[in-house]
């Protein structure tokens, strides 16, 4: 009887352990971060400085910016992942520049502009919203956006979360476009002290959640802080990866291990801006 009870205890312990291992098998042992530098393409020297940052920084370029194509080529040569930073109508301060999506556009014009904006940036792997606090709240318009993006089967989407009411990530996932959202804004305040504090929060978030995604801008304060901070990542035990890799890890963590082989994978595995 005692032997049978011991066998039952061992069996139950095994089930508990195997369940724990299944739930933790895809959790990165090393905290993973990604950093997107937005708003690239208008200032050539500033863009070069961003492209030359140490490690797997992801570079997001505004469509039709005078140096966007040239800098995107340089980013690709530097083995940086390239994104389209897609202008979208905001609630206020709509200084969006060329290529902006607005709510007054017809469906055809809207989708045509999405296609031309994506075509304007070489080596583009994904896209995120520039401003967009008005547009990203609209399921209809975000549906148009994601339908237009489906002509490429390898694009991902990052919701910059310029409003807490955004439905952009949801609409992307409804169409099986790999998507995620920003966790940290590095430079809602441009002071170097704030950027450093936000980088500390980025690491804290990654250690707590396994992954963390930050967005910054090519401000002198942000670039200088990153230039000093990025070489310290290995010492901190943090891994910087392209956004596509972070999304792949996050998607794996959302799918139970026993679902991996049967599930249909998606098409690729304080803020002041609105």
Where are each of the predicted segments found?
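Catalytic beta/alpha-barrel core
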Residues: 40, 58-64, 128-138, 153-163, ...
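Alpha-helical scaffold elements lining the catalytic groove of polysaccharide deacetylases
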Residues: 97-119, 136-141, 170-207
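N-terminal signal peptide c-region/cleavage motif recognized by signal peptidases
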Residues: 20-24
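Active-site beta->alpha N-cap acidic-glycine motif
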Residues: 27-94
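Hydrophobic faces of well-ordered beta-strands that scaffold small-molecule active sites
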Residues: 33-37, 57-60, 80-86, 127-129, ...
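Bacterial N-terminal signal peptides
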Residues: 10-19
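Substrate-binding cleft of extracellular glycoside hydrolase catalytic domains
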Residues: 71, 75-123
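C-terminal domain-boundary segment and adjacent tail
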Residues: 149-158, 162-163, 218-274
